[in-house]
Design a protein with these regions (language model features):
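Residue-level signal for inorganic ion chemistry
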Residues: 20, 37, 80, 341, ...
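Short acidic-glycine loop/turn motifs at beta-strand connectors
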Residues: 23-24, 48, 133-137, 143-145, ...
């Protein structure tokens, strides 16, 4: 299909795709890379019954918000499409995307009360990232393709990680790998490396120590705000379940504040890491368990724990059927749901919302500037709480 359309982008949808409504009436969904208000020439990729899918081939009239992308690899790399926006504009557009996406699930007053926390820096914020290695050199995935583009720098990576990226790649075979740097020491690692990263959480006078391949929040600076928000939302609740806990990003600060915490994590290695951190820090009130919460039997210890509240931070794919499992815990009064994909979260939270659980706070953190991704906190209270 080589048909070209002249379109005006009405708004951005989830995942950064543009929406246009030409005179024909059928909606056109445009691949990421456009901004609201822009006029574009677009190539049709597929024509479906209810909508047409297209990609921009030329920006005819750019948005006033568009600015030059600072990265020399931007034309080939698909990892930072929002890099043409200033951080403040990026946060506003993400808030609009969130409100639009959630409008079919959440009440208008909840969306009107959305709090937006911008990123403290727009670039050089990631202390963990992924690279594709080919012939000992770092590469990035191309725009909506499996093509690999060579990298000499990445503006998303923290300075020590970006500076050592090429050296780290030389130690790896072909494939996709996680690389990371310690915010405390700036020492760099590949996921195959020995040693460990020190991840300070200064507001709670503690640090996490994790092996190089362990997941942690890449934007460690804004993660401090995320932790503060979660801990504040759980003020007044003494017994807290931390579900999908990782190595203790929330469990250990909560324990430091005197909570009794049961942390449940699907990765047994991450759960052991969390337990090791708790012992090292003298936080005996934090218990870590390795268990797959997709299995009904894994919920028995959680129910037996009698949590008054829970924080959950599931993977991007969500946690199917978790709503029913949570509602089966009669002691629960509050949920603090941390989400990196609100579409999946709203799907999973639907049983709770239908049962009358109410959202008392909704927060967007621009955890991933330069990209369409965001982190969202949703606080839900039991209707009879």
């Amino acid at each position: 299909m080589n048909d070209l359309l002249t379109l005006r982008v009405e708004k951005l949808l989830w995942r950064g795709r543009g929406l246009a409504r030409p005179d024909s009436g059928k909606a056109v969904m445009i691949e990421p890379g456009v901004l609201p208000g822009e006029s574009i020439a677009a190539r049709v990729l597929a024509d479906h019954k209810d909508y047409t899918r297209a990609e921009s081939v030329e920006i005819l009239a750019p948005s006033a918000l568009r600015r030059p992308h600072p990265c020399p690899h931007a034309a080939d790399c698909g990892g930072s499409r929002f890099g043409v926006l200033a951080p403040e504009a990026s946060a506003r557009i993400k808030a609009d995307m969130l409100r639009d996406t959630a409008s079919r699930s959440l009440e208008p007053d909840v969306l009107a009360g959305l709090r937006v926390i911008p990123a403290p820096r727009g670039w050089r914020y990631r202390w963990r990232g992924q690279i594709h290695v080919r012939n000992g050199r770092p590469h990035a995935m191309g725009h909506a393709s499996n093509d690999l583009a060579p990298l000499t720098d990445c503006h998303l990576l923290s300075p020590p990680l970006a500076a050592d990226m090429e050296n780290l790649a030389r130690s790896l075979p072909d494939g996709r790998f996680t690389i990371a740097a310690s915010p405390a020491t700036e020492e760099t690692f590949t996921e195959r490396g020995r040693g460990g990263l020190i991840l300070p959480i200064p507001d709670f006078d503690l640090d996490l120590r994790v092996p190089p391949g362990t997941f942690f929040q890449a934007n460690w600076e804004l993660n401090q705000t995320l932790i503060r928000e979660v801990v504040a939302a759980l003020d007044g609740f003494g017994r807290v379940a931390d579900l999908f806990s990782g190595a203790g990003n929330f469990a250990l600060p909560l324990a430091r504040r005197g909570k009794t915490v049961l942390a449940v994590e699907g990765s047994s290695a991450a759960a052991r890491c969390g337990a090791d951190n708790a012992r090292r820090l003298g936080l005996a009130q934090a218990e870590f368990r390795g268990a797959n919460l997709a299995r009904p039997a894994s919920w028995e210890p959680v129910r037996h724990f009698l949590p008054q509240a829970a924080v959950l931070d599931p993977p991007r794919t969500g946690a199917k059927d978790i709503g029913a499992a949570l509602m089966s815990i009669s002691s629960l009064r509050r949920l603090v749901w941390v989400s990196c994909d609100v579409v999946n979260t709203l799907r999973d939270a639907r049983p709770l919302l239908r049962a009358g659980w109410r959202i008392s706070d909704l927060v967007l953190l621009d955890m991933f500037p330069g990209t369409w991704h965001m982190e969202v906190i949703m606080v839900l209270d039991r209707p009879d709480a």
